[in-house]
Amino acid sequence: MKQIRFSKHALGYTASRGFTVAEVEDAIRTCAWAATELGRLDCRKDFGYGREWNGKVYATKQVRPVFVDEAGEIVVITVYTYYF
C-alpha cells in the first residue's frame, strides 16, 4: 500500500473546505479512481454529515481528492468538498 502525501496547497484548505485527512485517505483507498485533466486522478466518497455548514444543515458531505499516482507514493494536489 502506497503512502499518501498531501501538498501544502491541499492541507491549507482542510478548515475552509471542511474535510479531514482521514476522509481523503479513505476515499482514495476505497473508491474507484477516474482520470482527469493533466494526467491527474480523482475519486469521490459520500460521508453522512447531518450538521451545519455555512449556515445550512446538510445530510451528506462528498469529498473529492485530486491526486497523482507516482511510483512510490500518492500525492494529493487539492481536495474539493460538496455538501448536499
Q: Where is each model-derived feature located?
A:
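Ribonuclease/tRNase effector modules and their secretory precursors
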Residues: M1-F84
